[in-house]
């Protein structure tokens, strides 16, 4: 299955570790008690078994290393069916030279979000970014950076058809806690396959 060139690989139906399940339950608790309104705020807040978790990352151009893999990567965790999907897609050098890391992060996140909304309509989505600027922009659908406006417009177009059916909650996690998505964005897949 693909959306906008995004291809997902199914990692299979596997048990979540106790630590992963605890982390997801903590995220749900935080969402249920956070101040502010998520996208489609008239809908019920998500419960652990009634949502999908997306974790995004993008690796931009490394000045001292022009040869290593740089791309976008996302994990999709579905607690109800205990399925895990992953995607990773390399960025062409032209894109790496023209876009900064927050732009790449939002581009990757928007494509994965679009895929999840189409594939699992009506299921609450919890997105996790390790980039604070990407998180803030995605939550508000607005930014102060002209370079990110195209991603906000794309995201609005993606979300609009789901306004009455699907809530999307976007949160920030410390970079050190997002290492799984970081490994995908750098194509470090050996330990997952």
Which residues fall in each region the model found?
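Two-metal-ion RNase H-like nuclease active-site motif
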Residues: 47-67
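Flexible, low-complexity interdomain linkers flanking nucleic-acid-processing modules
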Residues: 183-193
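RNase H catalytic domain
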Residues: 113-179, 186
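C-terminal reverse transcriptase regions that engage the nucleic-acid substrate
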Residues: 1-44
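Mobile genetic element proteins and their domesticated derivatives, centered on retroelements
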Residues: 1, 27, 57, 74, ...
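Short, flexible loop/turn motifs enriched in small residues
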Residues: 63-72, 121
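A short, polar/acidic, helix/strand-boundary loop motif
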Residues: 77-107, 115, 133, 138-150
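Short, flexible loop/turn elements at secondary-structure junctions
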Residues: 57-62, 76-81, 91, 131-133, ...
């Amino acid at each position: 299955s693909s959306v906008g060139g995004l291809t997902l690989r199914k990692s299979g139906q596997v048990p979540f570790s106790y630590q992963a399940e605890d982390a997801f339950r903590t995220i749900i608790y935080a969402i249920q008690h956070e101040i502010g309104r998520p996208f489609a705020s008239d809908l019920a807040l998500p419960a652990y078994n009634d949502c999908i978790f997306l974790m995004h990352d993008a690796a931009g151009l490394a000045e001292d290393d022009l040869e290593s893999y740089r791309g976008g990567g996302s994990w999709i965790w579905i607690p109800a069916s205990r399925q895990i999907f992953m995607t990773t897609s390399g960025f062409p050098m032209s894109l790496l030279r023209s876009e900064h890391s927050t732009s790449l992060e939002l581009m990757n996140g928007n494509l994965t979000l679009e895929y999840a909304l189409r594939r699992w309509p009506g299921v609450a989505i919890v997105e996790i970014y390790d980039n604070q600027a990407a998180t803030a922009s995605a939550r508000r659908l607005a930014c102060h950076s002209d370079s990110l406006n195209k991603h906000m417009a794309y995201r609005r177009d993606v979300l609009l058809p789901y306004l009455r059916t699907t809530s999307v909650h976007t949160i920030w996690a410390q970079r050190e806690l997002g290492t799984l998505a970081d490994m995908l964005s750098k194509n470090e897949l050996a330990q997952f396959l």
